[in-house]
């Protein structure tokens, strides 16, 4: 049996699309945050929620764009999305989250 010091180590790379999916699924767990094609994103075939991610080693910063259903409290939904996204990134990616900015791109009725 190999001792821990003799086992070869490797690298781990998680594709940005996986990180985006984690963020998307996290955001959609928040009541009032809904899936929606909006603006230019709809022309590109992208739906909200959507994330733009910046990584630097173990550090992640995310901009999350969401749609909120009317009459949900917009500010509370955005705060909850920020908290849930941070929690999911830390739990599922073992990442050190430096920032999560949430942008409400549209309200649905």
What residues fall within each predicted segment?
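Contiguous, often N-terminal, cationic amphipathic patches that form binding interfaces
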Residues: 1-75, 79, 91, 95-109
């Amino acid at each position: 049996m190999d001792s821990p010091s003799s086992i070869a180590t490797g690298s781990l790379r998680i594709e940005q699309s996986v990180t985006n999916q984690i963020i998307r699924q996290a955001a959609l767990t928040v009541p009032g945050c809904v899936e929606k094609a909006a603006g230019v994103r709809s022309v590109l075939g992208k739906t909200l929620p959507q994330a733009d991610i910046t990584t630097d080693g173990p550090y992640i910063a995310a901009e999350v764009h969401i749609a909120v259903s009317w009459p949900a409290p917009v500010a509370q939904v955005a705060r909850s999305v920020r908290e849930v996204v941070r929690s999911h990134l830390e739990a599922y990616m073992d990442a050190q989250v430096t920032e999560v900015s949430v942008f409400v791109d549209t309200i649905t009725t």
